Amino acid sequence: MLACASLAACDGPPDRTPTLGDASAVKGRQLVADKGCVACHTFPDVKWPRGGLGPSLEDFGRQGLIAGRLPNQPGMLMQFVRNAPALVPGTAMPAVSMTDQEARDVTAYLLTLKPR
């Protein structure tokens, strides 16, 4: 019994990395329109408006980096879509008011964007 307790203590703290959980890419697609992302970015399934200020996100799901600097991983992307300036100072992308669930949904949508 003591050996089991000792081994359990060696595992370290539990992994608290955010996950997509019950995220909905369909809701995320609607949110990029509702939150104004389409004003600056282009998306493969949005015909208008087609923003040109920010980068095209048409194949975002296959990119290795967010904003050319951060690893394209769900937890990092959830933080970035909510508060890009906190992660990449000087970015033109503003902080966007959204709930944790909305950030998960937008992240799920963005990660589906891959070349066909």
Task: State where each predicted segment sits.
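C-terminal motif of bacterial Sec signal peptides marking the signal peptidase cleavage site
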Residues: 6-9
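Electrostatic cytochrome c docking/interface patches
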Residues: 11-33
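Detector for the c-type heme attachment site
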Residues: 11-12, 40-47, 62, 82, ...
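Stable alpha-helical elements in mature extracytoplasmic
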Residues: 24, 36, 73, 77, ...
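Short sequence/structural segments immediately N-terminal
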Residues: 25, 31-32, 87-88, 115-116
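Gly/Gly-Pro-rich "capping" loops immediately C-terminal to redox-active cysteine motifs
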Residues: 25, 29-31, 43-78
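The canonical Cys-X-X-Cys-His
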Residues: 28, 34-44, 93, 106-109
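Axial heme c-ligation environment in periplasmic c-type cytochrome domains
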Residues: 51-60, 80-113
